[in-house]
Protein backbone atom coordinates (compact mmCIF):
# COMPACT_ATOMS: atom_id res chain seq x y z
CA UNK A 1 0.00 0.00 0.00
CA UNK A 2 2.89 2.33 0.66
CA UNK A 3 3.71 1.85 -3.03
CA UNK A 4 0.31 3.36 -3.90
CA UNK A 5 1.05 6.26 -1.60
CA UNK A 6 4.32 6.99 -3.39
CA UNK A 7 2.59 6.72 -6.73
CA UNK A 8 -0.14 9.12 -5.80
CA UNK A 9 2.50 11.49 -4.42
CA UNK A 10 4.36 11.28 -7.69
CA UNK A 11 1.23 11.85 -9.77
CA UNK A 12 0.15 14.83 -7.73
CA UNK A 13 3.63 16.33 -8.04
CA UNK A 14 3.84 15.87 -11.77
CA UNK A 15 0.29 17.17 -12.25
CA UNK A 16 1.40 20.41 -10.73
CA UNK A 17 4.55 20.54 -12.83
CA UNK A 18 4.67 22.59 -16.00
CA UNK A 19 6.84 20.10 -17.89
CA UNK A 20 4.63 18.83 -20.73
CA UNK A 21 6.20 15.37 -20.80
CA UNK A 22 5.68 14.88 -17.10
CA UNK A 23 2.12 16.06 -17.50
CA UNK A 24 1.46 13.63 -20.29
CA UNK A 25 2.14 10.74 -17.95
CA UNK A 26 -0.39 12.04 -15.47
CA UNK A 27 -3.43 11.01 -17.47
CA UNK A 28 -2.12 7.47 -17.80
CA UNK A 29 -0.97 7.08 -14.24
CA UNK A 30 -3.98 8.67 -12.65
CA UNK A 31 -6.22 5.67 -12.98
CA UNK A 32 -5.82 4.06 -9.58
CA UNK A 33 -4.99 6.62 -6.96
CA UNK A 34 -7.48 6.54 -4.12
CA UNK A 35 -10.94 5.17 -3.45
CA UNK A 36 -13.42 6.89 -1.17
CA UNK A 37 -17.09 6.70 -0.21
CA UNK A 38 -19.84 9.32 -0.46
CA UNK A 39 -20.62 10.48 3.06
CA UNK A 40 -23.00 13.37 2.62
CA UNK A 41 -24.77 15.11 -0.29
CA UNK A 42 -26.15 18.62 0.00
CA UNK A 43 -27.12 20.19 -3.32
CA UNK A 44 -23.99 20.40 -5.38
CA UNK A 45 -21.74 19.74 -2.39
CA UNK A 46 -20.59 16.22 -1.70
CA UNK A 47 -18.53 15.07 1.30
CA UNK A 48 -16.37 12.04 0.63
CA UNK A 49 -14.47 9.89 3.11
CA UNK A 50 -11.10 8.49 2.09
CA UNK A 51 -9.24 6.05 4.31
CA UNK A 52 -5.94 6.65 2.49
CA UNK A 53 -4.45 8.68 -0.35
CA UNK A 54 -6.57 11.65 0.58
CA UNK A 55 -6.88 13.97 -2.42
CA UNK A 56 -5.67 17.55 -2.28
CA UNK A 57 -7.49 20.82 -2.85
CA UNK A 58 -8.35 21.26 -6.58
CA UNK A 59 -7.98 17.52 -7.32
CA UNK A 60 -10.57 15.99 -9.60
CA UNK A 61 -12.52 13.01 -8.24
CA UNK A 62 -15.23 10.89 -9.86
CA UNK A 63 -18.31 9.15 -8.46
CA UNK A 64 -19.22 7.05 -11.48
CA UNK A 65 -19.54 9.62 -14.29
CA UNK A 66 -20.05 12.51 -11.91
CA UNK A 67 -17.01 14.80 -11.83
CA UNK A 68 -16.25 16.78 -8.68
CA UNK A 69 -13.47 19.12 -7.60
CA UNK A 70 -12.07 19.00 -4.08
CA UNK A 71 -12.79 22.40 -2.52
CA UNK A 72 -12.02 21.85 1.17
CA UNK A 73 -10.43 19.31 3.49
CA UNK A 74 -12.73 18.94 6.46
CA UNK A 75 -10.94 16.60 8.80
CA UNK A 76 -8.67 13.58 8.62
CA UNK A 77 -10.01 11.64 5.64
CA UNK A 78 -13.06 13.75 4.75
CA UNK A 79 -12.98 16.09 1.78
CA UNK A 80 -15.70 18.46 0.58
CA UNK A 81 -16.22 18.45 -3.17
CA UNK A 82 -18.13 20.68 -5.55
CA UNK A 83 -20.04 18.77 -8.23
CA UNK A 84 -19.23 19.80 -11.80
CA UNK A 85 -22.02 17.77 -13.38
CA UNK A 86 -25.60 17.15 -12.12
CA UNK A 87 -25.70 14.96 -8.97
CA UNK A 88 -28.57 12.89 -10.35
CA UNK A 89 -28.37 9.26 -9.26
CA UNK A 90 -25.70 9.82 -6.62
CA UNK A 91 -26.22 7.88 -3.39
CA UNK A 92 -24.64 7.64 0.05
CA UNK A 93 -21.83 5.10 0.29
CA UNK A 94 -21.18 5.12 -3.45
CA UNK A 95 -17.52 4.65 -4.39
CA UNK A 96 -15.51 7.72 -5.35
CA UNK A 97 -12.37 7.52 -7.39
CA UNK A 98 -9.61 10.11 -7.00
CA UNK A 99 -7.57 10.96 -10.08
CA UNK A 100 -4.69 12.43 -8.07
CA UNK A 101 -4.59 15.53 -10.27
CA UNK A 102 -6.57 18.69 -10.97
CA UNK A 103 -8.61 19.06 -14.19
CA UNK A 104 -6.27 18.57 -17.14
CA UNK A 105 -7.19 20.15 -20.46
CA UNK A 106 -5.71 19.67 -23.93
CA UNK A 107 -3.63 22.61 -25.18
CA UNK A 108 -1.97 23.61 -28.44
CA UNK A 109 -2.93 23.74 -32.11
CA UNK A 110 -5.34 20.79 -31.75
CA UNK A 111 -7.90 22.91 -29.87
CA UNK A 112 -8.10 25.59 -32.57
CA UNK A 113 -11.43 25.75 -34.37
CA UNK A 114 -13.12 23.80 -31.59
CA UNK A 115 -15.96 24.43 -29.18
CA UNK A 116 -15.11 22.90 -25.79
CA UNK A 117 -16.32 22.69 -22.21
CA UNK A 118 -14.51 23.20 -18.90
CA UNK A 119 -12.82 19.78 -19.18
CA UNK A 120 -11.58 20.54 -22.71
CA UNK A 121 -14.15 18.05 -24.05
CA UNK A 122 -15.87 18.78 -27.36
CA UNK A 123 -19.38 20.24 -27.41
CA UNK A 124 -19.41 20.74 -31.18
CA UNK A 125 -20.28 17.12 -31.94
CA UNK A 126 -16.81 16.36 -33.30
CA UNK A 127 -14.26 13.90 -31.85
CA UNK A 128 -12.06 14.95 -28.91
CA UNK A 129 -9.15 17.24 -29.85
CA UNK A 130 -6.12 15.20 -30.80
CA UNK A 131 -3.71 17.00 -28.45
CA UNK A 132 -0.48 15.44 -27.21
CA UNK A 133 -0.14 17.77 -24.25
CA UNK A 134 -2.56 18.56 -21.47
CA UNK A 135 -2.20 20.94 -18.56
CA UNK A 136 -3.71 21.53 -15.17
CA UNK A 137 -6.12 24.46 -15.20
CA UNK A 138 -4.71 25.77 -11.93
CA UNK A 139 -1.53 27.68 -12.69
CA UNK A 140 0.31 30.50 -10.95
CA UNK A 141 0.46 33.90 -12.69
CA UNK A 142 3.81 34.88 -14.26
CA UNK A 143 6.31 36.44 -11.84
CA UNK A 144 6.58 40.21 -11.91
CA UNK A 145 9.87 40.47 -13.78
CA UNK A 146 8.47 38.29 -16.59
CA UNK A 147 5.65 40.74 -17.28
CA UNK A 148 5.86 43.51 -19.84
CA UNK A 149 3.68 46.50 -20.55
CA UNK A 150 3.04 47.53 -24.14
CA UNK A 151 2.04 50.97 -25.16
CA UNK A 152 0.43 50.26 -28.48
CA UNK A 153 -3.21 50.41 -29.41
CA UNK A 154 -5.46 47.70 -30.78
CA UNK A 155 -7.58 49.48 -33.38
CA UNK A 156 -11.17 48.25 -33.24
CA UNK A 157 -12.80 50.26 -36.03
CA UNK A 158 -15.46 51.36 -33.53
CA UNK A 159 -15.41 55.16 -33.40
CA UNK A 160 -16.45 55.73 -29.79
CA UNK A 161 -13.96 53.19 -28.43
CA UNK A 162 -10.97 54.12 -30.58
CA UNK A 163 -11.46 57.82 -29.83
CA UNK A 164 -12.29 57.87 -26.12
CA UNK A 165 -11.19 54.57 -24.65
CA UNK A 166 -8.45 53.09 -26.86
CA UNK A 167 -7.75 49.42 -26.18
CA UNK A 168 -4.25 48.52 -25.04
CA UNK A 169 -2.57 45.75 -27.02
CA UNK A 170 -1.60 43.22 -24.36
CA UNK A 171 -3.84 44.87 -21.76
CA UNK A 172 -7.24 44.26 -20.21
CA UNK A 173 -10.35 46.12 -21.30
CA UNK A 174 -13.76 45.89 -19.63
CA UNK A 175 -17.14 46.54 -21.25
CA UNK A 176 -19.38 47.55 -18.36
CA UNK A 177 -23.14 47.74 -18.53
CA UNK A 178 -26.41 46.75 -16.91
CA UNK A 179 -28.79 44.22 -18.43
CA UNK A 180 -29.57 44.61 -22.11
CA UNK A 181 -27.50 47.69 -22.96
CA UNK A 182 -25.53 45.92 -25.71
CA UNK A 183 -22.50 44.20 -24.14
CA UNK A 184 -22.89 40.99 -26.12
CA UNK A 185 -23.51 42.83 -29.40
CA UNK A 186 -20.41 44.94 -28.78
CA UNK A 187 -18.17 42.00 -27.91
CA UNK A 188 -19.38 40.15 -31.02
CA UNK A 189 -18.57 43.23 -33.10
CA UNK A 190 -15.11 43.35 -31.55
CA UNK A 191 -14.55 39.72 -32.53
CA UNK A 192 -15.69 40.57 -36.03
CA UNK A 193 -13.42 43.60 -36.32
CA UNK A 194 -10.31 42.48 -34.47
CA UNK A 195 -10.09 38.68 -34.83
CA UNK A 196 -9.90 38.96 -38.62
CA UNK A 197 -6.97 41.38 -38.43
CA UNK A 198 -5.32 39.70 -35.45
CA UNK A 199 -2.16 37.81 -36.31
CA UNK A 200 -2.23 35.35 -33.42
CA UNK A 201 -5.04 33.18 -32.13
CA UNK A 202 -8.32 34.14 -30.47
CA UNK A 203 -10.08 32.55 -27.53
CA UNK A 204 -13.67 33.17 -26.65
CA UNK A 205 -14.84 32.18 -23.20
CA UNK A 206 -18.58 32.24 -22.46
CA UNK A 207 -19.30 32.25 -18.73
CA UNK A 208 -22.84 31.95 -17.40
CA UNK A 209 -24.59 33.41 -20.45
CA UNK A 210 -27.34 31.97 -22.63
CA UNK A 211 -26.52 28.88 -24.69
CA UNK A 212 -28.40 30.37 -27.64
CA UNK A 213 -25.76 33.12 -27.83
CA UNK A 214 -23.03 30.48 -27.96
CA UNK A 215 -24.66 28.85 -30.95
CA UNK A 216 -25.07 32.21 -32.74
CA UNK A 217 -21.44 33.08 -32.06
CA UNK A 218 -20.22 29.78 -33.43
CA UNK A 219 -22.11 30.44 -36.64
CA UNK A 220 -20.89 34.04 -36.89
CA UNK A 221 -17.29 32.97 -36.38
CA UNK A 222 -17.68 30.58 -39.29
CA UNK A 223 -19.19 33.33 -41.47
CA UNK A 224 -16.39 35.76 -40.53
CA UNK A 225 -13.85 33.07 -41.48
CA UNK A 226 -12.04 33.23 -38.13
CA UNK A 227 -13.19 29.93 -36.65
CA UNK A 228 -10.08 27.94 -37.55
CA UNK A 229 -7.84 30.20 -35.45
CA UNK A 230 -10.28 30.53 -32.59
CA UNK A 231 -11.05 28.36 -29.58
CA UNK A 232 -14.47 28.67 -27.98
CA UNK A 233 -15.06 27.59 -24.40
CA UNK A 234 -18.38 27.57 -22.68
CA UNK A 235 -19.70 27.16 -19.15
CA UNK A 236 -23.21 28.47 -19.68
CA UNK A 237 -25.95 29.50 -17.26
CA UNK A 238 -27.51 26.03 -17.31
CA UNK A 239 -24.34 24.47 -15.88
CA UNK A 240 -23.20 23.90 -12.29
CA UNK A 241 -21.63 26.86 -10.43
CA UNK A 242 -18.34 24.94 -10.22
CA UNK A 243 -18.20 24.79 -14.02
CA UNK A 244 -18.94 28.49 -14.43
CA UNK A 245 -16.29 29.21 -11.84
CA UNK A 246 -13.60 27.10 -13.52
CA UNK A 247 -14.21 27.58 -17.25
CA UNK A 248 -12.29 30.91 -17.24
CA UNK A 249 -9.27 29.04 -15.92
CA UNK A 250 -9.58 26.46 -18.67
CA UNK A 251 -9.54 29.29 -21.22
CA UNK A 252 -6.51 30.87 -19.58
CA UNK A 253 -4.59 27.61 -19.50
CA UNK A 254 -5.03 27.30 -23.26
CA UNK A 255 -4.18 30.99 -23.78
CA UNK A 256 -1.03 30.65 -21.66
CA UNK A 257 0.17 27.73 -23.75
CA UNK A 258 -0.19 29.78 -26.96
CA UNK A 259 1.60 32.69 -25.28
CA UNK A 260 4.41 30.89 -23.46
CA UNK A 261 5.12 27.76 -25.48
CA UNK A 262 4.19 28.88 -28.98
CA UNK A 263 5.14 32.57 -28.51
CA UNK A 264 1.90 33.81 -30.07
CA UNK A 265 -0.23 36.86 -29.39
CA UNK A 266 -3.61 35.91 -27.99
CA UNK A 267 -6.89 37.77 -28.10
CA UNK A 268 -9.02 36.62 -25.17
CA UNK A 269 -12.68 37.60 -25.06
CA UNK A 270 -14.74 36.85 -21.99
CA UNK A 271 -18.51 37.17 -21.80
CA UNK A 272 -19.24 37.65 -18.89
CA UNK A 273 -16.66 38.01 -16.15
CA UNK A 274 -19.29 39.05 -13.59
CA UNK A 275 -20.73 35.55 -13.92
CA UNK A 276 -17.36 34.20 -12.77
CA UNK A 277 -17.65 36.25 -9.58
CA UNK A 278 -21.26 35.18 -9.18
CA UNK A 279 -20.35 31.50 -9.59
CA UNK A 280 -17.61 31.98 -6.95
CA UNK A 281 -20.24 33.39 -4.64
CA UNK A 282 -22.52 30.38 -5.25
CA UNK A 283 -19.65 27.97 -4.55
CA UNK A 284 -18.78 29.91 -1.42
CA UNK A 285 -22.39 29.66 -0.24
CA UNK A 286 -22.47 25.92 -0.95
CA UNK A 287 -19.32 25.51 1.11
CA UNK A 288 -21.04 27.30 3.98
CA UNK A 289 -18.75 30.35 4.09
CA UNK A 290 -20.12 33.49 5.68
CA UNK A 291 -21.02 36.09 3.02
CA UNK A 292 -19.22 39.42 3.05
CA UNK A 293 -20.07 42.87 1.68
CA UNK A 294 -23.38 43.01 -0.31
CA UNK A 295 -23.64 39.22 0.07
CA UNK A 296 -20.54 38.46 -1.99
CA UNK A 297 -18.02 35.82 -0.97
CA UNK A 298 -15.29 36.92 1.50
CA UNK A 299 -12.74 35.66 -1.04
CA UNK A 300 -13.98 37.91 -3.88
CA UNK A 301 -10.73 39.87 -4.29
CA UNK A 302 -8.42 36.85 -4.23
CA UNK A 303 -10.60 34.77 -6.54
CA UNK A 304 -10.77 37.56 -9.07
CA UNK A 305 -7.03 38.21 -8.82
CA UNK A 306 -6.32 34.49 -9.36
CA UNK A 307 -8.00 34.85 -12.75
CA UNK A 308 -7.03 38.41 -13.74
CA UNK A 309 -3.36 38.16 -12.74
CA UNK A 310 -2.91 35.31 -15.21
CA UNK A 311 -4.20 37.50 -18.05
CA UNK A 312 -0.97 39.32 -18.70
CA UNK A 313 1.69 39.89 -21.32
CA UNK A 314 5.16 38.45 -20.95
CA UNK A 315 8.36 38.65 -22.96
CA UNK A 316 7.20 35.59 -24.90
CA UNK A 317 3.82 36.86 -26.09
CA UNK A 318 0.86 39.05 -25.26
CA UNK A 319 -2.66 38.30 -24.09
CA UNK A 320 -5.05 41.11 -24.99
CA UNK A 321 -8.30 40.59 -23.18
CA UNK A 322 -11.69 42.17 -23.62
CA UNK A 323 -14.17 41.31 -20.91
CA UNK A 324 -17.86 42.07 -20.74
CA UNK A 325 -18.88 42.99 -17.19
CA UNK A 326 -22.52 42.88 -16.15
CA UNK A 327 -23.25 45.64 -13.65
CA UNK A 328 -26.06 44.54 -11.31
CA UNK A 329 -28.92 47.06 -11.14
CA UNK A 330 -26.73 49.58 -13.06
CA UNK A 331 -24.88 50.17 -9.77
CA UNK A 332 -21.24 50.87 -10.58
CA UNK A 333 -20.31 50.86 -6.88
CA UNK A 334 -21.22 47.16 -6.68
CA UNK A 335 -18.21 45.34 -5.13
CA UNK A 336 -17.87 42.92 -8.07
CA UNK A 337 -17.86 45.72 -10.68
CA UNK A 338 -15.51 47.86 -8.57
CA UNK A 339 -13.02 45.00 -8.07
CA UNK A 340 -13.04 44.07 -11.76
CA UNK A 341 -12.53 47.74 -12.66
CA UNK A 342 -9.31 47.87 -10.63
CA UNK A 343 -7.68 45.20 -12.84
CA UNK A 344 -8.28 46.95 -16.15
CA UNK A 345 -6.30 49.34 -18.32
CA UNK A 346 -9.34 50.54 -20.26
CA UNK A 347 -13.02 50.56 -19.40
CA UNK A 348 -15.83 51.15 -21.83
CA UNK A 349 -18.98 52.04 -19.91
CA UNK A 350 -22.31 51.45 -21.63
CA UNK A 351 -25.13 53.70 -20.49
CA UNK A 352 -28.78 52.83 -20.30
CA UNK A 353 -29.77 56.39 -21.13
CA UNK A 354 -27.92 56.28 -24.45
CA UNK A 355 -29.31 52.84 -25.25
CA UNK A 356 -32.84 54.13 -24.56
CA UNK A 357 -32.23 57.01 -26.99
CA UNK A 358 -31.11 54.51 -29.63
CA UNK A 359 -27.53 55.86 -29.56
CA UNK A 360 -25.75 52.52 -30.21
CA UNK A 361 -23.09 51.55 -29.25
CA UNK A 362 -24.28 53.10 -25.97
CA UNK A 363 -20.75 54.14 -24.92
CA UNK A 364 -20.82 56.76 -22.19
CA UNK A 365 -18.22 59.28 -23.43
CA UNK A 366 -17.65 60.84 -20.02
CA UNK A 367 -17.38 57.67 -17.93
CA UNK A 368 -15.27 55.56 -20.35
CA UNK A 369 -11.53 55.79 -19.79
CA UNK A 370 -8.23 54.28 -20.85
CA UNK A 371 -4.69 54.62 -19.58
CA UNK A 372 -3.68 54.69 -23.25
CA UNK A 373 -5.35 58.06 -23.82
CA UNK A 374 -2.19 60.14 -23.34
CA UNK A 375 -0.30 62.26 -25.90
CA UNK A 376 2.70 59.92 -25.61
CA UNK A 377 0.69 56.91 -26.79
CA UNK A 378 -2.06 58.17 -29.10
CA UNK A 379 -0.36 61.40 -30.21
CA UNK A 380 -1.13 65.02 -29.37
CA UNK A 381 -3.82 65.49 -32.04
CA UNK A 382 -5.86 62.45 -30.97
CA UNK A 383 -5.52 63.46 -27.31
CA UNK A 384 -6.65 67.05 -28.01
CA UNK A 385 -9.64 65.94 -30.11
CA UNK A 386 -10.74 63.41 -27.45
CA UNK A 387 -10.47 66.11 -24.75
CA UNK A 388 -12.44 68.59 -26.86
CA UNK A 389 -15.16 65.99 -27.59
CA UNK A 390 -15.48 65.19 -23.88
CA UNK A 391 -15.54 68.89 -22.94
CA UNK A 392 -18.24 69.68 -25.50
CA UNK A 393 -20.38 66.75 -24.37
CA UNK A 394 -19.88 67.66 -20.69
CA UNK A 395 -20.93 71.28 -21.35
CA UNK A 396 -24.01 70.01 -23.18
CA UNK A 397 -24.86 67.82 -20.15
CA UNK A 398 -24.74 70.94 -17.94
CA UNK A 399 -26.92 72.90 -20.35
CA UNK A 400 -29.58 70.18 -20.61
CA UNK A 401 -31.46 71.35 -17.51
CA UNK A 402 -31.58 74.94 -18.70
CA UNK A 403 -32.79 73.82 -22.11
CA UNK A 404 -35.49 71.68 -20.48
CA UNK A 405 -36.69 74.60 -18.35
CA UNK A 406 -36.23 77.64 -20.58
CA UNK A 407 -35.81 76.28 -24.08
CA UNK A 408 -32.92 76.38 -26.52
CA UNK A 409 -33.68 79.97 -27.59
CA UNK A 410 -32.74 81.35 -24.19
CA UNK A 411 -29.15 80.17 -24.56
CA UNK A 412 -26.37 82.47 -25.71
CA UNK A 413 -25.10 82.06 -29.29
CA UNK A 414 -21.92 80.40 -27.97
CA UNK A 415 -23.92 77.88 -25.93
CA UNK A 416 -26.17 77.16 -28.89
CA UNK A 417 -23.08 76.29 -30.92
CA UNK A 418 -21.93 73.96 -28.14
CA UNK A 419 -25.33 72.23 -28.19
CA UNK A 420 -25.31 71.91 -31.99
CA UNK A 421 -21.81 70.45 -31.96
CA UNK A 422 -22.53 68.11 -29.03
CA UNK A 423 -25.69 66.70 -30.60
CA UNK A 424 -23.83 66.05 -33.86
CA UNK A 425 -20.91 64.47 -32.00
CA UNK A 426 -23.30 62.22 -30.07
CA UNK A 427 -24.81 61.03 -33.31
CA UNK A 428 -21.51 60.75 -35.14
CA UNK A 429 -20.26 58.43 -32.38
CA UNK A 430 -23.05 55.97 -33.12
CA UNK A 431 -22.22 53.33 -35.69
CA UNK A 432 -23.96 50.55 -37.59
CA UNK A 433 -22.57 47.18 -36.49
CA UNK A 434 -21.96 44.11 -38.61
CA UNK A 435 -23.17 42.02 -35.68
CA UNK A 436 -26.41 44.04 -35.44
CA UNK A 437 -27.28 43.87 -39.15
CA UNK A 438 -29.93 41.21 -38.59
CA UNK A 439 -32.00 43.34 -36.20
CA UNK A 440 -31.04 46.93 -37.13
CA UNK A 441 -31.28 46.41 -40.89
CA UNK A 442 -28.25 48.69 -41.42
CA UNK A 443 -25.05 47.54 -43.11
CA UNK A 444 -22.13 47.49 -40.66
CA UNK A 445 -19.23 49.94 -40.98
CA UNK A 446 -15.63 49.80 -39.78
CA UNK A 447 -14.07 53.24 -39.32
CA UNK A 448 -10.35 53.94 -39.07
CA UNK A 449 -9.00 56.11 -36.26
CA UNK A 450 -7.90 58.69 -38.86
CA UNK A 451 -11.48 58.95 -40.21
CA UNK A 452 -12.91 59.19 -36.69
CA UNK A 453 -10.50 61.98 -35.77
CA UNK A 454 -11.16 63.84 -39.03
CA UNK A 455 -14.94 63.61 -38.50
CA UNK A 456 -14.83 64.82 -34.89
CA UNK A 457 -12.41 67.60 -35.74
CA UNK A 458 -14.67 68.86 -38.50
CA UNK A 459 -17.71 68.94 -36.20
CA UNK A 460 -15.73 70.68 -33.45
CA UNK A 461 -14.55 73.39 -35.85
CA UNK A 462 -17.96 74.13 -37.36
CA UNK A 463 -19.78 77.21 -36.12
CA UNK A 464 -22.82 77.17 -38.39
CA UNK A 465 -24.69 74.02 -39.26
CA UNK A 466 -26.82 73.86 -42.37
CA UNK A 467 -27.30 70.10 -42.20
CA UNK A 468 -29.57 67.94 -40.04
CA UNK A 469 -28.41 66.13 -36.91
CA UNK A 470 -29.92 62.95 -38.28
CA UNK A 471 -27.40 62.99 -41.14
CA UNK A 472 -24.75 62.09 -38.58
CA UNK A 473 -26.72 59.20 -37.08
CA UNK A 474 -25.64 55.57 -37.69
CA UNK A 475 -23.07 56.39 -40.32
CA UNK A 476 -19.46 55.24 -40.73
CA UNK A 477 -16.96 57.96 -41.64
CA UNK A 478 -18.19 61.50 -42.29
CA UNK A 479 -18.83 61.86 -46.04
CA UNK A 480 -16.97 64.60 -47.94
CA UNK A 481 -20.01 66.82 -48.57
CA UNK A 482 -20.50 67.32 -44.83
CA UNK A 483 -17.78 69.96 -44.78
CA UNK A 484 -18.04 73.17 -42.82
CA UNK A 485 -20.37 75.79 -44.23
N1 LIG B 1 -25.13 48.23 -31.76
C1 LIG B 1 -26.44 48.00 -31.66
N2 LIG B 1 -27.25 48.37 -32.65
C2 LIG B 1 -28.57 48.16 -32.56
N3 LIG B 1 -29.18 47.58 -31.51
C3 LIG B 1 -28.42 47.17 -30.49
C4 LIG B 1 -27.00 47.36 -30.50
N4 LIG B 1 -26.50 46.88 -29.35
C5 LIG B 1 -27.54 46.41 -28.65
N5 LIG B 1 -28.69 46.58 -29.31
C6 LIG B 1 -30.04 46.19 -28.83
O1 LIG B 1 -29.97 45.87 -27.44
C7 LIG B 1 -30.36 44.52 -27.21
C8 LIG B 1 -29.52 43.91 -26.08
O2 LIG B 1 -28.18 43.78 -26.45
P1 LIG B 1 -27.22 42.70 -25.77
O3 LIG B 1 -27.85 41.35 -25.79
O4 LIG B 1 -25.89 42.87 -26.39
O5 LIG B 1 -27.20 43.26 -24.30
P2 LIG B 1 -26.40 42.72 -23.04
O6 LIG B 1 -25.92 43.93 -22.35
O7 LIG B 1 -25.40 41.70 -23.46
O8 LIG B 1 -27.57 42.05 -22.27
P3 LIG B 1 -27.54 40.92 -21.13
O9 LIG B 1 -26.96 41.57 -19.94
O10 LIG B 1 -28.99 40.61 -20.98
O11 LIG B 1 -26.73 39.79 -21.69
C9 LIG B 1 -30.15 43.84 -28.56
O12 LIG B 1 -30.96 42.72 -28.70
C10 LIG B 1 -30.52 44.95 -29.52
O13 LIG B 1 -31.91 45.05 -29.68
From Swiss-Prot:
F-type ATPases have 2 components, CF(1) - the catalytic core - and CF(0) - the membrane proton channel. CF(1) has five subunits: alpha(3), beta(3), gamma(1), delta(1), epsilon(1). CF(0) has three main subunits: a(1), b(2) and c(9-12). The alpha and beta chains form an alternating ring which encloses part of the gamma chain. CF(1) is attached to CF(0) by a central stalk formed by the gamma and epsilon chains, while a peripheral stalk is formed by the delta and b chains. GO terms for cellular component: plasma membrane; proton-transporting ATP synthase complex. The gene is atpD2. This is ATP synthase subunit beta 2. ATP binds at residues 177-184. The lineage of its organism: Bacteria, Pseudomonadati, Pseudomonadota, Betaproteobacteria, Nitrosomonadales. CDD domains: ATP-synt_F1_beta_C, ATP-synt_F1_beta_N, F1-ATPase_beta_CD. Residues 1-10 have a biased composition (Basic and acidic residues). Residues 11-24 have a biased composition (Polar residues). It is an enzyme of class 7 (translocase). PROSITE patterns: ATPASE_ALPHA_BETA. The keyword Zinc-finger does not apply. Its EC number is 7.1.2.2. It catalyses: ATP + H2O + 4 H(+)(in) = ADP + phosphate + 5 H(+)(out). One of its GO terms (molecular function) is proton-transporting ATP synthase activity, rotational mechanism. It is a peripheral membrane protein.
